[in-house]
C-alpha cells in the first residue's frame, strides 16, 4: 500500500514538474521574443497561408498553443484581426503545437541534468534580460524531461499490473474508450502537450508480453481525444470576449472535432500511414516518435483540408454563434 502511494505521488509530482516546466518555458520565451511575436501576429493580412505560417511559427516558439490562441482572441476582440484573418492563424497554432511532441520524442531524459546545468549557467552568465530569459527557457526545457523521467519511474510497475493490462486491452479493442480517456485527461490537466507526453511515455513501456502497453493502434485514439480536449481553453477564454472571438474559439473546436471524427473513422489507415512515415525499429524504441508524427500528420492534413474552406468555416461559425437579434 505504501509503495503504491509513493508511485502515485511520484506520477503526479512528475506531471506537476512537467506542467511547471511548460509554463516556465512559455513565459521565458515570451520575455525573450514576445513583443516581436505579437507584432508578427498583428501584421497578418488577408493571406490565409501567411496566417497559418504566422500561427505555426509563434506557437512553435512559445511552446503553448493555448497562449497563442488566447492572444489571437484578444486581437480579434480589439479589432486588430478580422474573423477571416484569425481562423487560418488558429489552424497554424495546431501545427505549431506539434513541435513539443516532436522534441519530447527524442527521449533526452538521460541528459536532462546537462540541460538543467546549461540553463542555470546561462542565467548567471547573461547580463541582459533576454539572455537570462533564454537561460530560464533552457532550464525549463530540462524540467520537462525531469518530469517525464519521474512519470516513467512511477508507471513502470503499472505495466505489470493485471487489472491495468486488462483495461488497456479494452482500450485497444474499443477506440472510443481511448478517445474518451484522452479527452478526459486533457480537460483535467488543461494541457494537451502534457497528456501527449504522458501518452508517449506510457506507450513506450513494455507490457507482460514485452510489447508496448498500448501499441500504435491503441495510442492514436487517445491522441485524438487529446486534440479535442485542448479546444476547451479557447472556449473558456472566449466567454467574456467579443462575438467574433467566440467564433474563433468555435472554429478551433470545429477544426479538431471534425478532424478527430474523420481520423477515428479511418483509424486503420491512420495507423498504417503513421507507421509508413515513421522510423523503423523495435516498437518500444520508435513508438514515441510515431505518436509525435501522428500528431503532426493529423494537424497538417486537417489544415490542408480546411484552409481552402476558410470562407465556409467562417460562414458556419457565424451561424453557430449568430449576432444578437436587434429589438
Name every feature range the model reports, one short phrase each.
Residues 1-9, 102-111, 165-170, 217-220, ...:
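Interfacial loop-to-helix junctions that mark the boundaries of transmembrane helices
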Residues 20, 24-32, 36, 40, ...:
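Membrane-spanning helices that line or support transport/gating and their immediate boundary helices
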Residues 15, 35, 39, 43, ...:
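Alpha-helical transmembrane segments of multi-pass membrane proteins, especially transporters
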Residues 17, 27-30, 66-70, 97-105, ...:
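Alpha-helical transmembrane segments and their lipid-water interface positions
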